[in-house]
Structure formats: C-alpha cells, structure tokens
Amino acid sequence: MQIKPIITYSGSCPLFRSLESQILNAIPLDTCEWRRTFQRPTKHVRLEAQAQQFNVAALEKYKQGDWSILEHPILHIFVTECNDVDTYKATIREAIDIWLKTLTSYGVSDWMILLVETLDMRKTKNFMPRTTVLDKIRLDFGTKNDDRCISVLNPAKFEQKSTESFRCLVQRIRFLMLTSYNRNIVKYEELIRSKREKRNIEGWDFRQYFFMQEDLALIFEKLELPTEALIQYDELDAMFSQFITHTGLNEKQQWLNHFRKPLDAFHGICLTRADKFEMRNKIRDEGVSLLEFRNYLFERQAYLLLTCNDIPEIAKRLLNFLFSTLREVELIKLECQEGALCCWEFVCALEVLQLCEQAMEPNELTCFQHCAPIWNLAKDKLYELGKLCGLLPGCTPTSEQLHIVVQLSSGIGDAPSEQHQFLQATPQLRDRSPNRKPKKSGAEQLKEALGSNQAFQKLYLELAELAISTYKHVTRLRSARLVGLDLGNFYCALNEPHKAVGFFTDLLRELKAENWHMLSSQTLLELANCYRKMGDSLAYTKTCSSISCCAELETLVRTFYFDEFLKSLKTLKTTLSAQPSIENANYCVLEDHFRILDIEVVNQKPIIQDDYILVQLKVESLYPRGVVAENVKLCYELEASSLELAMENVSLTASPSTVKAKDTSSRLKVSLQLVYKQDNRLHSAAVACDLPKSKQPVRRTSSTKRKLSPSVQADFTNFVQAENIALQPGVNLIEMKAKATRVGCWQFKQLCISMSSLEFLSEQLPFMPATFEISTKPASATLEFKTLIAGIVQPISLNVSGGSFIFPPDAKITLRCSKNLRIRQARNTDDEAAYNDDQSFESTLQVPLVQFKSFEERRIPLEVLTDMPGRKVSKHHEHHIALNCPWSRTELPIAVDFQPAMEATCRLHTCGTQKFLQVIMKGMEAHLLLQHAQVKCDVPGVQLLDLNPESQQPIEIYKSLTVTYLYEIQVEPLKTEHELPVVKVHFVIKYASLSQPDVWRTYGCAFDLVDYTTLFKLQAQLEPNELCRLRTVCNMNLKITKVHENPYTDLMYEVLNDQNLWAVCGRSAGVVSMKDVDSHSISLDVMPLSTGFLPMPSIRLSKYTAGGKSKTDGHSKVHPFPPGQVYNSTKSMQIHVIASVAGDQ
C-alpha cells in the first residue's frame, strides 16, 4: 500500500512528466520545518509525493464531504513553457483561468503555476522585453498569491544554470504542501468529529469511521510523527472498547455483526509481518473476527511505539490488551473452541517477549518490570492448555484430547513465511550472534509443546524459571515466590520433591514474614510431604513440629502431625549421628512453637555478685498435647549503652533491680533530653516520647528478614536455666536460676528450649527485653595524709573498704616502703618507751584485718619516718609505699612526698690570710629545737676552731628563721692547696620537735671546701685622702701583692665604679705581669661626682691568658678568681668627699 501525498499537474503534461522524476526525488532529500496551526509545536518533517494528472473526480468527493485525506490531492500544479507574452495572452491565460475556476468551485486553494523558461541567447543580447510572461501571470492570477507563481529554468536544456532555480522550486513545493496539510488536516479533523458525533444514528458504521481516522494516522506516520499517529489509534481503541461495553448494556449496534464471526482461527499478533496492511485490506473487503481486528489494532500501535523507540510501552500495554479483548469476547458472546483463547494469549505474550528480549539491557529495569507478568501469564496459559490436553506430569492424552490438540494447532495457524522486522532501522534492537539459531515464533513453540509431554514440560519449566528470575530482577519477590509455588507443585507432580523444597521454603519465608498464617500452614503441609518423600528425617521432624503448632489447621491434622513429630524425634538422635555435621541443622524457631508472655526477675533486693538470680518465665505452648523440655535456658548479655552526640538521654524508668516485662503498648517510653552547648551550659531541655509503631499486616520482605530457622545463636555464656520441665498446652510458669558471676547491667537476649536433639531458639523477644543489674562494690585501700615533713614522725591513715569481697580469717595488707622510709602502726599509749624508739619503724609492715566483713570500712592509723636530706633540694623528697591487698594480685604503688623540715648552707669568708666557715640553718616547714652543733674534719693538717658561744638552752627554729654558726679554718703552712685540693667538712646538729622535746635526732650535712688559699692581696689608697673635693681629680694607687706562689703570672685588673659616684680619667682596666715579682703598683686618676662618704671604687682581679700562642687559640681570655683566692682590702673603705666651693653639695 503506497501512502504518499498526491500532486496533480495540468497544462503542458509532457513537460511536467519530463521533470517529474527529478522533482519527486528531490522532495524527500531534506527535512523542512512544519509550523502547525492552533499553537501546536513546530515539527521537522520529511515529505514524499506522487504525481497524478488532474482529475475532477477526486474533487467531487471532497466537495460532497466523503473524501479521504490519503486520496485527496495535496497540491495542484499548472505547468507551461510559454516564453512569449502574446502567446500567453492568446491561449495560456485562458487555460489557467479555467483551471483555477475549476479548483475554486470545489473549494480548493492549494495550487501553483510553474513556468518552465527556455532562454534564447540571441534574443537576450539584442532585445530585452519590458514585461515577461512570469510578470503577466503574477499580475493576472497572483496579486495576492505571488509566491504561488514560480519560474524555473528547464534542467534538461540548462543543467548548470538551472540548479538554483530548481532548488527554489523544490523548497516552494515543500512549503505549499505543508500549508495544504495545515488546511486539509483541520478540515479532515472536523469531518472526523462530525462523523463521530453521528455514532448513535442508525446506519452508522464503525468500520467506515475507523478507516477515516486511520487515514489521518497514516498521514502522521508518513510525516514521521509517530506520536500523533499513536493518538489516533488510541482513540479508535478506546471508542471500540466503549461500543463493546455498551453492547453488554443492551445497546445493540448493527455493525457489530461483522465482528461476530466464530473464532475458528485464533492467530496471535505478529510483529514481524511482511505486509503490515494485509489485515487492513481484509477488514475492508472480507470482514474479520474480533480477535483479528484487535490483533491488527495492537500491531499498528506496537509499530508506532517501535518507531518511537519505546519498547517497554509495548510490554506495558500487552496485558491490558489481552484482558480487555477477553472481556469483549465474553460480552459479545463469541463462539470459540475450548483452549482457543489460551492459545491466542500465549502466542501474543511470546511475540512481545521475543521483541523485548532484543532490546532489553540488564541495567534498565523498566522493560523487565512489564515483562515479568507476561512471562507468568504465558506460563499459566500453557499450564491450562496442558491440563486440557492431558500433558501434565503423570497424565497420558486420550484420543479426545489428541483431537483437541489437532484442532488447536490448526487454529493457531502458521507463522509468516518471511519474517522481516517491519521497522528495519531500529537502533535499540541488538543483532543476534551469527552462530546462534533464531528463536522459534510463539505459534511454533506452542505447537511443539502441545505435541508431546516432554516438550510441554521443558517449555513450562523454562517459562517458570524466566518468570521467577525476571520478578527477582525487578525485586518483586512476592510474585516470584508465588510463581515458585506453581513450579514446586509441578516438580512434586514430576516426583522430584528435592527440587520443589527450595521453592516451598522461599514461599514459606515470605508468608511468615508477612503474617499470612493460613497460607503458611498450607505450605508447611506441602513441605512435610516433600521431606517425607525425600527421607529427610530431621527436616521432616521440624516441619511436623511446626504443623502441629498451627492453630489455623484442624485439630485432627495437628494431632496427626504431633504424633509424627514424637515418633520421628525418638529416632532422630541416631540419624543425626550418622549424618555429617550441618550448621544450625537442629535449630528451630521458637516463635513457631511457643510464645514468650512475660519475663520477671524475682529478686527483691539488689543482685550482688556471687548471689543467685531468680527469674520467672511465662511461656505459652502451642502444641496440642504436653511435651517435656529437657532444658530451658534464657541467656543475658551486657546492655549496650547508647550515647548521643548532641543530647544526653536520662531514662525516667523504674529501678532495674526488679524488672518485669510489660507490653510495649501499656507504658509509653518517656525520656528526658538535655542539650548542652559547647561550654557545657544547658541549652534546652525537653521530654520526648517514642510511640511504638503499629504492626503492619504486609511489609516488604527486604525489611523483615524472616527466617525459617535461626541463623545466629546468642552468647550463652551467661544464662539462667531450668531442667526437665513439663510444658502443657497453654500458659506455663517456669522458675529459673543461676549464679551471678559478672557485674553490670544485663539484658535478656534469647530463649532456648531443648527437646531431645532439637533446640528451639527465639529470634527476638516479643517485647522490650527486661534489664537487671548485678552490682558489686570493689574492695579498696587508700592512704590518707596531709603535708608530710621529712625528719620527724608523720601520721598517715590506711583506709580499707571491704566492698563485696569475702575476707579470709587471716587476711592482711602488706605495706612495703621505698629506701630510707620506715613505717609503723600508731603508738600504743601503754608503751611510751617503745613509741619514742625509732627502732620500732620498719620498711615492711603487715597490717592484719581481723574479722573484716564485706562492705565494712575501717580506718587504721599509721606513722612514717624518713631521714632529712643532707643537702639543699630544689623539690620535695619523693618516696613510695606499695600496698599488697588480699583481693588483688598486683601491688598498688602510692607516691608519698615529704617536705624538708630545714636546710643547711655554708659560706667561706676571708680576712687577709685567715679563713672562716659560716653554716646557715634555715627553717622550712617544721617548728624544731636545735642544740649541740658540731663541725668535724678528718683531713690531717686542717683544724676547725669553734667561734660560737656555748649555749645551754636549745635554739628554736621555724619557717623563714635562720640560725648561723661560725668556724675558723686553720691549715698548716706546709699543706698547700695542691696537696689538699678538697677539704671535706661534716656538720652535725641535734634537733627535736616541739611535740616530742625529749626525742633528739641527728641531722648531718657534708660540705666540700675548695680554693680556700689566698693567692693575691689587693690594696688601694686615694691621694689626697683628707682633702678630696668634688669634681677634683685624685690619684688612686693600687697595689697587688702575691701571698702564695701560684702559676698565674698575668693578671687583669678592672675598676668597676658607680657612674653616679666616680669617674675614671683614662684607662679603667689593664694587664700586669707578676712573673718574678711579689707585688705590683698601679696609679689611676679618678674624680668624685658626689659629696659625702663615698665607697672606694670597686676593683676586680682576674686571670688573664694572652691569645695567639697557638692556631686554635686566637683570642685572649679572662677567667675570674674564686672568692677565697683574692683578698680585697678596699671593700669596706669609704672616702669623705667635700665640696669644692660653698655652693656645691
């Protein structure tokens, strides 16, 4: 069927025929913009055309209103080759006028006048006419439509020069065709609308209306507007369905008799039909059945959707198409053979599925979502046909059923001999592998499946697996489980229960998760039958146990399976020992057999470690008769602490010591929420209430995670238990107990009931787990003391807290002190002498804990004593006391810091050649008494003379008070400093505290005396000494005298004067050499700057080492003398300075 716009031609017909092929071939070479009316969106379309000679007959239908837009000419062209104005006026103008009047009389305004020019070069060189034929044509006929009058050079004679004019001609034809379409489509839509409004008038025929509106759809399709064409087919589909529905309401339509043909042939849709308009011609000429008409309508819609590259929409529309067609067949009561409609549905489903398989990508779920129910539909229809034809497992077709197969096979028909995809250039369709055989059509597969039981079973299993996998791919697990139920039943019919078990198990898990109790009970019966056939005693035992607890089943059924459960349970132990180890094989879900009603901790007092936990469990047995549980265990774990970053939740519930499990709906969970700022200040406070979520009857499987057997067993390290408990049907109270071994806040987690080789584990407790606390108070020992002072007895106390520890009769605490620290228990008032004796202090002390009870607290007074440090320390004196307690295997070290009671320092003083030692005692922290200070020196040749007065009374010393002792050091002249470089001096003194004035202890300190020999003596004299005036230069004579021989030959002197008192005139420093001389004199000029008694300018003497004596030592160095080697006799001298004039001060 050729669908191309018609262009008519008049005038010089041979001339147009010479140009026809070029014009018709050039029109579709490029797209053009179609600006539609009524503000419809602009489209880019590609036009094609066919040419016919002008005929008035087509315009007669147009005038009468009985015309088709496919057959109506879209453009009328008048062609002339007249290049002479006179000839035009004589003949051509009249012919054009008659032609235009004819078009106008039929209401046609889509015309064009084409002037084909033939240039005469000789005339154009000598004569140029004022008016051309084209100007005359436009003047006569194109005053308002001059764009419809076009001239073109004859391409046959002027091939090179005619290119531009020919291109303009083709563009003008495209434009006028689209302009004509705008006008004609609007008129045609009005015509369709008027026809549709007459649908209730007697004699109205839907078939005529169908072809009229389909012609419009074909025009849109030809213009490459498949969406617009699809709208027309959808309107026809909806209108036809509406007519059929009204027919069911006793509104009879005469034209429906054409579709009431018996369904002798029930071909399915064919999306690979070679001639897509074959059925259109059959509908027009012969008449078709309802199924054939519906097939053609869906095929046309599918073709347009393929053009739009919307294959998922085809799959989406298929089920609606099938169901609505079946309803229409039922409404108009068509006669058909049993199974015919199933065959038709099956072929249609497989045809669409094969198309989708070529276009589907694994990552695009849209098409899979629509294909999954189609696979399921094909599977169901095939099963119905198998049941009808005796092809199910275990059945043998009878002669009558074989006759049905023959009739159905003939009604299905054959697939088209040449299968070509009627949309050739579809980029989304994937090419098959060249080595892969093309799939058979749906009709061929159905015929093959109806031919034998093996082919039927193979196709059914393939369709079922495809349906399940597609449902799973689009995460429609419920639908996949239902398909698995059918597949499981099919495997059971095939006597292959081991393959059916997996599908039944998946379905059972889904049904239990969504609380379909009745359906899950029926599935359990199927599972029990499978396990019995398989000989799986363990699974059969567990399934029989679950069936006996199903309240939805009859009592006789439950009792039968309960007896089977007890019978199989006796032989289960030997069966399990013979089988290999299977993880969680003997676990059962407790909730399927028992219901936990309440868990209550019976202990009335706080549970202390090593005490017994008493728990009362209320559980309901769902068995029809009583059973004996060998062991009932309830484990508990440490409660997880929930910490919030932005808020602090403080629970307002009761004390956890007595916890009773309540229903979550009886008490609201109220909690206090405190929100703090960054500086720990309270920002806001609120009371929050967490409402329990209502139980959902149907939930997503991905969120429920219901399992047939518990996969995780909780940690049963801590549990309460009861043994040999008889559980009767209904509510049972079970008393359980266990010893509390670990402390903490505990929460019940899982219940385990053991019967023979089976263990029934709870998935989770049905209410908020009861919490209880096992508390313990750890025993502790601490030392309590204030500031401790070294050298005197200091009191400390040992505080022992028993906590929950059980003390043995011989319990004791051992205290071990560090070096120079001793300890004892506090004094006994009856033994004063032993108290004053320091020998009672020990480095290790054992304190017995006589009759010490749990939770008892005892304070034991102790005393410590440590030696006073002999030298000055910058920090406190640190010691350690290690506690060894009976409740701990490790020692507990405790740091003990002592402050010194006093400290001793010494200074060396020189007077000429005499040396004096000054010992300064400074009080620090204690109030003490001092007496009998002595200095000892064991070095021969050194003698210390005590210069202190003899005192009979002790001297008190306290903080910030100092006591000074002075001694003279005499060294024999022969004992030089080289022989005695260091003189060790020991200072010893007795001290006692005010609290114990009779107990005297010894404090000793050692000093090292170095550089104590006077090497040089420095003298200075100021002249004039008596008449020293202000701002008058005076002469200061310095004298350096060597007292003892020494290696220092070069000395440097410096005058360190106060700039406010003295000014040195000239050099203030210099170097003198004492080599081979005993003394050296220096004269300096100084000037007093102030009046009064001024101290003599200070003079410093230092060791001098000249530089440059070696390569490594290039600079001179100055080293100071120690204080004892240089005696400066000018330190205490003062000079009286008087004013030079009366006004100076």
Curated annotation (Swiss-Prot):
Spell out the InterPro entries in the cross-references: Ig_TRAPPC10, TRAPP_II_complex_TRAPPC10_C, TRAPPC10/Trs130, TRAPPC10/Trs130_N
Localisation per UniProt entry: Golgi apparatus, cis-Golgi network; Cell projection, Dendrite; Perikaryon
The record's note on quaternary structure and interaction partners says: Part of the multisubunit TRAPP (transport protein particle) complex. Interacts with Shal (via C-terminal dendritic targeting motif).
Task: Summarize the protein's role.
Answer: May play a role in vesicular transport from endoplasmic reticulum to Golgi. Has a role in one of the several mechanisms underlying dendritic localization of Shal channels.
Q: What Gene Ontology cellular component terms go with this record?
A: cytosol; dendrite; Golgi apparatus; perikaryon; TRAPP complex; TRAPPII protein complex
Gene behind the chain: SIDL
Family, according to the entry, reads as follows:
Belongs to the TMEM1 family.
* A Pfam family per the record: TRAPPC10
Q: GO annotations under biological process?
A: early endosome to Golgi transport; Golgi vesicle transport; intra-Golgi vesicle-mediated transport
Chief location category:
Golgi
Keyword Transport in record = yes
Q: Which UniProt keywords apply?
A: Cell projection, ER-Golgi transport, Golgi apparatus, Transport
Organism domain of life: Eukaryota
Question: What is known about the tissue distribution of this protein?
Answer: Co-expressed with Shal in the nervous system.
User: What name does the UniProt record give this protein?
Assistant: Trafficking protein particle complex subunit 10
